[in-house]
Amino acid sequence: MGLPDGSDQGTHQTQALLSAAQEMELQRRDYHVERPLLNQEQLEDLGHWGPAAKTHQWRTWFRCSRARAHSLLLQHVPVLGWLPRYPVREWLLGDLLSGLSVAIMQLPQGLAYALLAGLPPMFGLYSSFYPVFIYFLFGTSRHISVGTFAVMSVMVGSVTESLTADKAFVQGLNATADDARVQVAYTLSFLVGLFQVGLGLVHFGFVVTYLSEPLVRSYTTAASVQVLVSQLKYVFGIKLSSHSGPLSVIYTVLEVCAQLPETVPGTVVTAIVAGVALVLVKLLNEKLHRRLPLPIPGELLTLIGATGISYGVKLNDRFKVDVVGNITTGLIPPVAPKTELFATLVGNAFAIAVVGFAIAISLGKIFALRHGYRVDSNQELVALGLSNLIGGFFQCFPVSCSMSRSLVQESTGGNTQVAGAVSSLFILLIIVKLGELFRDLPKAVLAAVIIVNLKGMMKQFSDICSLWKANRVDLLIWLVTFVATILLNLDIGLAVSIVFSLLLVVVRMQLPHYSVLGQVPDTDIYRDVAEYSGAKEVPGVKVFRSSATLYFANAELYSDSLKEKCGVDVDRLITQKKKRIKKQEMKLKRMKKAKKSQKQDASSKISSVSVNVNTNLEDVKSNDVEGSEAKVHQGEELQDVVSSNQEDAKAPTMTSLKSLGLPQPGFHSLILDLSTLSFVDTVCIKSLKNIFRDFREIEVEVYIAACYSPVVAQLEAGHFFDESITKQHVFASVHDAVTFALSHRKSVPKSPVLATKL
């Protein structure tokens, strides 16, 4: 037995030594790359670059064929694709149990959220039936539970309360206040569905990407606070005035505080008992969720128990506890939306449409990622829109999906929207036969159901701490969205938060991180010298990079930051150079003027000398020596004038910084790393051309590196390249540009071998 143990120990030691040797080998492993130095022209030739072939997608869209029609049908009615292939044995039992569990939650939430929307409870059941069945036909998510949702209900409630508070508005509809609220709600649902279907058909599902996660979470948190405030009147049993618009939450809280002496004790006790019972059941479900096949239906049991106690004890008569009252049974015929309300509701409808879709698609993507399938955002928009659009004809109010019900649908074995269809059929049974049994249900119990279900959204206050550590800008978005939604109401708050979020995007694009790059030793990698102490600037070469793309909003800032990082006051140096050149030119002009005057004097002297042909021989002879001396002297003066003119013509213009007595930059080449550019506009092109011009004025050659082909094509289309700036100034990488700048300063680009040791 000892021998095998020793051999095993030796084997383990050998394996450990081998793994250590392999690790050291990996750490020492180098590779050697040898390739030509490539500028853009050479790269295009080597890679056979050419514009991508244009695909006429519109031809495919408008092509008529049986296959195309079948594909469109399956795309827009997904149930026809997956239902024929539904694995009954594997999934049906789970979907049935899941649908029953969701329906048990859907019933109390539908009744409660109808009150939240300012409507009779029965309309909450309608909104839990029609839209759910429509989504079963057109939706692509297998797990989300469509129906009433607190945030949507409070948004609808704010609209119904604000409009019906005006007596003239109610009289204009020729209806009671309750009927007017119903008309506003189902007309609003029709408009919301119209917006969602229209946006989905034109593939505007990407719009929701502009609603960041901090914005959506903050908005739903603020909405949950408004939900909580709106339920205080049912908890305390007090009558409140209708407040709408900015600061309505503040006014409501102040009025609740003023009305506290009129609290109905029986209502408060009922709400507290129901709330405690719901919390205990939820805690029990969380603790025993692994042992229980289905969660305990705490909400349904609470509603049944509260209804029985209220009926037996006569809470309404003896303790003045408000109850739901008469609930009509049976389905109601469809009605047309009130077209005269369209202009009044269009703004609120668009806000509700965006929020509802944002919540639905975010939950849908979470479950799709968890279970490995794909959710089509555009089809989801159409499906949710049809749910609201058709629901509007059957007097439903706008719906979305609920996180709590969706989690129950997933955790209880739901695999497809068959679970949703089962839950809608169960709700149909309640509507047709059992709805009237809940007429003695206390409204305080429904308020307790709503408040307890806000637990998940109230937990989102913890985002403040996590965002403080992770990203202060996202925290700012969260806080601004929350405050704006609380103070300005849901519709204006959403608009303010979206505008603020987009404004922050613009500001962050205008304030990118600018850096000077240095080479990491023995590599072709270049990093920010301020962050990497081992990265060293290449002598004579300055490499500059921005963390954001360059466009009209930050082009000037890019140019200013470049000059600042280079440590050279380019504008001042150019101004001084121009002044020195102008001064030199003025000096040359003065010299030319002086020489010109000398020339004129000499010419006058030459022209004054003449020979009189009539002089006698004796005069000529006597003046021969004298005349020859004068001619020699005059010839010398003429030669001086000619030579001075030639010197003026050949005098060089001294324009270099050194000859002008100006300081020279500490580098001879500037490389712009444009790897972060995703597009360019005309302002960007003009800014880059100005950079080339200005730095060449101070004797610094400029190169571009790591520019993607689409951006190069845009530069070419914008007439960036000309005789002075060619594609030979654009290089495949920063290292190519650095190598060229060091070895080919102010020369025609060639193709030396670039050897890089890594």
Swiss-Prot record:
The modification Phosphoserine is found at residue 751. Its main location: membrane. Expressed in kidney (at protein level). Expressed in spermatogenic cells. Expressed in intestine, kidney, testis, brain, muscle, heart, and stomach. Expressed in the submandibular and sublingual salivary glands. PANTHER family: SULFATE TRANSPORTER (PTHR11814). GO terms for biological process: angiotensin-activated signaling pathway; bicarbonate transport; cellular response to cAMP; cellular response to fructose stimulus; cellular response to type II interferon; chloride transport; epithelial fluid transport; establishment of localization in cell. It comes from Mus musculus. It comes from the Eukaryota. The gene is Slc26a6. This is Solute carrier family 26 member 6. Residues 139-187, 285-292, 362-380, 439-485 are extracellular. It catalyses: 2 hydrogencarbonate(in) + chloride(out) = 2 hydrogencarbonate(out) + chloride(in); oxalate(in) + chloride(out) = oxalate(out) + chloride(in); oxalate(in) + formate(out) = oxalate(out) + formate(in); oxalate(in) + sulfate(out) = oxalate(out) + sulfate(in).
